[in-house]
Amino acid sequence: PSGMSFNTWMCPADTGDGEAMSLRAGAELANIEFLRMTVVPRSFNAAGLNALSGMGAVLINAKGEAFMDRYHPLGMKGPRYKMVQGVLNEMREGRGPVYMDCRGIAPEAQKHLIATLSCDKDSFKDYFEQLGIDLTTTPMEVDTSEGMQGGPNEVCGSGVKINKDCGTNVPGLYAGGNGADQCRSLHMAVTSGIHAGRMAAHYCASL
């Protein structure tokens, strides 16, 4: 990894304070041992390469070799963690730096890609312009993110252990969103936040 503590796609303020406070209050935590990593543009602390790889970009090492077939039978279509493994291994074995190469993407697809780069990452296009990177002619250097809070699968996260009412083993303490062990992803964060708030209000009204 880069050694930069905030080299993740998570908000820099997301430092686990909620889980820590809950633990000190006596709440149980679950799945904390799971971490996740991803491949990120060098010095741009946000994920954003799925669009590139999904349209045909490939990871290459400093020798210009496309290497993902060495790490998974599906190559670039393999699981994200295999991409991380591949990038780390290439760098550790002296074949870095590693690049995302978009030169093989069809011209029309390249235009679409560049036009939509900033849809969910406002400064992504600025990043390329300021570094003078033309994705149609120049491979982009990538790195691996730091380890982030993860979970055993894409649905189940890690954090404060909750029940169906978003309650914990501490009476009156409720949790939702990324701080809870069952609420990974945006829709789960929204619905669990609403439900946890309602259940907390019911608890207060019963006192």
Where are these regions (language model features)?
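Hydrophobic alpha-helical segments, especially N-terminal targeting/anchoring helices
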Residues: 60, 162-163, 189
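Short FAD-binding loop at a beta-strand-to-alpha-helix junction that anchors the flavin cofactor
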Residues: 1-3, 165-185, 192
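An anion/pyrophosphate-binding glycine-rich loop and adjacent beta-alpha core
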Residues: 27-142, 199, 203-205
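Short, small/polar residue-rich loop motifs at catalytic or cofactor-binding pockets
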Residues: 52-54, 154-156, 182-183
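FAD/FMN-dependent oxidoreductases across multiple families
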Residues: 127-169
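Generic recognition of stable, solvent-exposed alpha-helical segments in well-folded globular domains
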Residues: 14-17, 119-126, 155, 168, ...
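Glycine-rich loop(s) and the adjacent beta-strand/alpha-helix scaffold that form part
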Residues: 1-46, 190-199
